[in-house]
């Protein structure tokens, strides 16, 4: 972002944006994993092209061991680059994301993940789009390579106000088919686990995309903490609650967790497309790991 535009940002947003950009620039693992000639979003092409000498930084999985054994030097296979991939982020800004048992809420981490997806796509010159839904707003960025528009979208996300706690987002709880996304796009569905079960229309629609469910999980969602002596603020009930972690509470939590997991699997049956991000872990590291796992599937 230009110096004049950067000057217009408030200090908090400017600091957050600079931190995201510098983290991406400073992460050598990104360039090592993806290579300079192809996008991490595309993976490698499937059509074989030729064999070339292996150089430092190339993907070790591409080594042609037969040619290497015959010639005595490391050689790797080259593949024809896959067609253009459009990256589309669907961010459902549900009030439940405002929960967090630690220093960061799930919403803060979700927004950071969305920003990394936008910035990384801009760096790789991919077309990227976004649909940001909440109970009060619905904002859409049509797929673009325009870096200025992408940076403006990152700033908008960083400055976005949390939705009202007492206004649940019905569109977030029961996802509907999103129109206007080019077929074959990589769709990152960043949201809480949907309610109910997917409709036949959803199943038919999702087959046209590389659709990956991404949710942020707090440690308290996995298990009941041993120490619940301190009062807890429930963002959905909008009140302070006190709980005693006895056997009955743990049993109820276990039932809730199991039911939630069943819903998660019903919406994303393929375990390779279900991605859980730990609210306490580094968002960028988790995001790159998710993309690299998807790259191996291609």
Q: Where are the model-predicted features located?
A:
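Exposed, interaction-prone extracellular/peripheral surfaces
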Residues: 1-40, 50-58, 67, 76-112, ...
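N-terminal juxtadomain amphipathic helix
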Residues: 60-62
């Amino acid at each position: 972002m230009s110096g004049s535009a950067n000057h217009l940002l408030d200090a908090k947003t400017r600091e957050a944006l600079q931190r995201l950009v510098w983290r991406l620039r400073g992460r050598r693992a990104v360039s090592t994993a993806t290579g300079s000639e192809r996008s991490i979003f595309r993976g490698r092409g499937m059509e074989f092209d030729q064999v070339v000498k292996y150089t430092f930084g190339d993907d070790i999985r591409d080594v042609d061991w037969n040619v290497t054994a015959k010639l005595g030097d490391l050689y790797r296979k080259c593949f024809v680059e896959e067609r253009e991939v459009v990256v589309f982020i669907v961010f459902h800004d549900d009030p439940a994301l405002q929960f967090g048992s630690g220093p960061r809420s799930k919403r803060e981490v979700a927004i950071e993940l969305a920003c990394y997806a936008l910035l990384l796509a801009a760096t790789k010159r991919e077309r990227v789009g976004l649909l940001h839904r909440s109970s009060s707003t619905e904002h859409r960025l049509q797929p673009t390579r325009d870096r200025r528009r992408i940076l403006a979208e990152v700033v908008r996300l960083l400055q976005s106000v949390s939705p009202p706690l007492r206004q649940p987002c019905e569109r977030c709880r029961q996802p509907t088919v999103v129109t206007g996304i080019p077929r074959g796009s990589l769709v990152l569905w960043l949201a809480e686990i949907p309610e109910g079960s997917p409709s036949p229309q959803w199943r038919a629609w999702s087959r046209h995309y590389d659709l990956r469910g991404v949710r942020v999980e707090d440690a308290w969602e996995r298990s009941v903490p041993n120490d619940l002596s301190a009062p807890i603020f429930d963002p959905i009930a909008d009140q302070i609650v006190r709980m005693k972690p006895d056997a009955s509470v743990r049993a109820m939590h276990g039932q809730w967790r199991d039911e939630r997991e069943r819903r998660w699997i019903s919406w994303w049956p393929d375990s390779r497309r279900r991605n859980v991000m730990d609210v306490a872990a580094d968002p960028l590291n988790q995001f790159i790991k998710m993309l690299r796992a998807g790259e191996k599937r291609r």
